[in-house]
């Protein structure tokens, strides 16, 4: 799973990982973290993924609750059951499970 963020560095790093995965013939999936910080670059990431034949599992919104959870040494689900990111992560997990036939 390639988790990227909508920034120039995020796109660059994602492209490098995709190139590496292609070189070694390793399947890859994409997930966009903090997608709502830059909708235009998020669209560019998703377009690139489609052009490369990659599945985009989903988008995770920016959520300050993540930092709070890390400080507490907990998952986002343990720390804040009403977080904005929680439903997105569950959706991505469901799609990943389907992709891997779990």
Language-model-derived ranges and their functions:
Residues 9-13:
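Short glycine/serine/threonine-rich phosphate/pyrophosphate-binding segments
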Residues 20-102:
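C-terminal lobe/tail of nucleotide-utilizing enzymes
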Residues 1-8:
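Inter-motif core of Ras-like GTPase G domains
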Residues 15-18:
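Histidine-anchored nucleotide/phosphate-binding helix
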């Amino acid at each position: 799973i390639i988790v990227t963020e909508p920034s120039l560095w995020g796109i660059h790093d994602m492209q490098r990982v995709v190139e590496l995965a292609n070189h070694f013939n390793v399947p890859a999936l994409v997930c966009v973290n903090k997608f709502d910080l830059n909708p235009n670059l998020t669209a560019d990431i998703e377009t690139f993924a489609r052009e490369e034949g990659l599945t985009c599992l989903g988008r995770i919104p920016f959520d300050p609750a993540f930092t709070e959870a890390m400080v507490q040494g907990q998952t986002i689900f343990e720390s804040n059951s009403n977080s904005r990111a929680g439903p997105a992560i569950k959706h991505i997990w469901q799609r990943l499970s389907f992709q891997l036939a779990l």
